[in-house]
Swiss-Prot record:
Species for this entry: Onion yellows phytoplasma (strain OY-M)
One Pfam family this sequence matches: GTP_EFTU_D2
Subcellular location field: Cell membrane
GO biological process: positive regulation of translation
Membrane topology: Peripheral membrane protein
InterPro entries, per database record: EF-4, EFG_III/V, EFG_V-like, EFTu-like_2, G_TR_CS, LepA_C_sf, LepA_CTD, LepA_IV
Protein name: Elongation factor 4
Coarse class of the protein's main subcellular location: membrane
Length: 605
């Protein structure tokens, strides 16, 4: 192809992503688009075709983003090349959404015609607006008996500020509206900007490890071209490689001769080092280098931390390798080695949220065969010492002694909760119990409200979302953004078994909630720790002060059973001997903490 032909081809490229609240039918609609355009043969079609992980299909959610090239002949008679970049809908994976949007010019915003606008819909709209994307609203699931199109169109106008007349109606189940969506993509989303004659600039928006091809980055070409044999340089890591292969996803890999501006695909270059490929980095040509990297997506910081330890201690190295490989296409995952007296060697690991933490643990177990124990999740605290120093603490065991601390600040979040009006009282009660401060209540319509709360992040990382769902019978939706740090009355609480501190059970608690939290943990441990030959005290302590205690009674052996008749002093002598033996056992005895006790404690909050 000559330059003019390539420029003409570029005018017929459309890059778009599909964004939606979790469970609004995004993956199903993507399936219908792929089926209608003939991208996927009906014989090999399976539900959620772009959700390549088994875990995604089982849970019915999208975790990783996926890109696929679609060829579509429009009503104007021209053939268009479309790149659909599928995105997750859960709040924890908004970084995946931001990566997708950095590679697009437009987005299809899917809204469930029965449920209406949800909290995450709102968050995704703001992300799209920040990226200057053209938004095409689509009302999905209009075939449901409970669908209320006029009401949802009114919500689009009032809550999102978009023109409701431009909203399309569709059904991912029946395929209704797919042609309208494709035609709107052609007419409303602009072709990609980019100059074929400028030095190569390609944005890495994802990557994964292939045991034969090495590290494979997914890229969006902004300027220039790339083909087999080119010398390329990764601008952040400054590493140079020779391109072995370029191609696109369909959704399996299809090798191409070259990739030009607007193309979304992949390249391989026998990259063996995981650290050389960073998501958000720019690839340029080694011989004709771009001066500046592309303004990439924003780097997301981990906000929830926990210790991950292998159940079988000899699998430490496999766990390390698993985390390194998962980090490759999940740039927000961070980890560093740590050790615990109770659990041995493991890693302090950072995540974007609780679902993210759960998914990573499950992937380690499924893909690498390593069962892990996770300690209680915590957030990053700002600790100011009496000398004026500021410490960042994500692990309770790193907290200095109380005498050395001037004040502790914890992160707060701005929470947006949408729910039916009848559940306002329950939502407010739950949020107040989690130390929340009400900011605003706004009626979306006569039945639904939007409630804004300021909440400590440490309070929602346990079971806030689960409780919210059960209190509102599943009707509430929840989204949050990190706000600033605020001073709180926080203290470190230690759990002692037989007088010894168990470091893996230490946690940072609010002073007002310390007693009930300590009492709950002691009761849980009493239930799950098996009896020993000696008595085991379980204590919760704030500094030197014990605030809660439970005792596991000793197993009793009847040492007087062999006596018959005779002197009572003989009986007393044997009981005294047993008492001394138990006292000695107690000083020497170690209490083993079973894994199920750890898991039960995580569920107590």
């Amino acid at each position: 192809m000559n330059i003019e032909q390539l420029k003409e081809r570029q005018k017929r490229i459309r890059n778009f992503s599909i964004i939606a609240h979790i469970d609004h039918g995004k993956s199903t609609l993507a399936d219908r688009i792929l089926e209608f355009t003939g991208t996927i043969d009906k014989r090999i079609m399976k539900e959620q075709i772009l959700d390549s992980m088994d875990l995604e299909r089982e849970r019915g959610i999208t975790i990783k983003l996926n890109a696929v090239e679609i060829n579509y002949k429009s009503k104007d008679g021209k053939n268009y090349i479309m790149h659909l970049i599928d995105t997750p809908g859960h709040v924890d994976f908004s970084y995946e959404v931001s990566r997708s949007l950095a590679a697009c010019e437009g987005a299809i915003l899917i809204i469930d015609a029965a449920q209406g606008i949800q909290a995450q819909t709102l968050a995704n709209v703001y992300l799209a607006v920040d990226n200057n994307l053209t938004l095409i609203p689509v009302l999905n699931k209009v075939d449901l008996p409970s669908a209320d199109v006029p009401k949802v169109k009114e919500e689009i106008k009032e809550t999102l500020g978009l023109d409701p007349e431009q909203a399309l109606i569709a059904s991912g189940k029946t395929g209704l509206g797919v042609i309208d969506i494709l035609e709107q993509i052609v007419t409303r989303i602009s072709p990609p900007q980019g100059d074929i004659q400028k030095p190569l600039q390609a944005l890495i928006f994802d990557s994964y490890f292939d045991s034969y091809k090495g590290v494979v980055p997914s890229i969006r070409i902004v300027n220039g071209t790339v083909k087999k044999g080119d010398q390329i340089r990764f601008m952040a890591s400054n590493s140079v490689y020779e391109v072995v292969e370029v191609g696109v996803y369909n959704p399996k890999q299809i090798v191409k001769d070259f990739l030009a501006p607007g193309d979304v695909g992949y390249l391989t270059a026998a990259i063996k080092s995981i650290n050389h490929v960073r998501v958000g980095d720019t690839i340029t040509s080694q011989t004709n280098q771009a001066l500046l990297p592309l303004p990439g997506y924003k780097q997301m910081n981990s906000v929830v931390f926990c210790g991950l330890y292998p159940v079988e201690t000899n699998k430490y190295d496999i766990l390390k390798e698993a985390l390194e490989k998962l980090k490759l296409n999940d740039s927000s995952l961070i980890f560093e080695p740590e050790s615990s007296n109770a659990l041995g060697l493991g890693f302090r690991t950072g995540f974007l949220g609780l679902l993210h933490m759960e998914i990573i643990q499950e992937r380690i177990s499924r893909e690498f065969g390593v069962e892990v124990i996770a300690t209680a999740p915590s957030v990053i605290y700002h600790v100011y010492s009496i000398k004026g120093e500021k410490l960042l603490v994500d692990n309770p065991s790193k907290l200095p002694s109380t005498q050395m601390i001037d004040r502790i600040e914890e992160p707060f979040i701005k929470a947006t909760i949408m729910c039916p009006e009848i559940y306002i009282g329950k939502v407010m009660e739950l949020s107040q119990n989690k130390r929340g401060a009400l900011q605003n209540i706004e009626y979306i319509d006569s039945q639904r409200v939007m409630i804004n709360y300021l909440l400590p992040f440490s309070e929602i990382i346990y079971s806030y979302f689960d409780k919210l769902k059960s209190l509102t019978k599943g009707y509430a939706s929840f989204d949050y953004e990190i706000d600033k740090y605020r001073v709180s009355k926080l203290q470190k609480m230690d759990i002692l078994l037989n007088g010894e501190i168990v470091d893996a059970l230490s946690l940072i608690v609010h002073h007002d909630f310390a007693y009930e939290r300590g009492k709950a943990i002691c009761e849980t441990l009493k239930e799950f720790i098996p009896k020993q030959m000696f008595e085991i005290p379980i204590q919760a302590a704030l500094g030197k002060k014990i605030i809660a205690r439970q005792t596991i009674k000793a197993m009793r052996k009847d040492v007087t059973a062999k006596l018959y008749g005779g002197d009572v002093t003989r009986k007393k002598k044997l009981l005294e001997k047993q008492k001394k033996g138990k006292k000695k056992m107690k000083t020497l005895g170690k209490v083993q903490l079973p894994q199920k006790a750890f898991l039960a404690i995580l569920a107590t909050k």
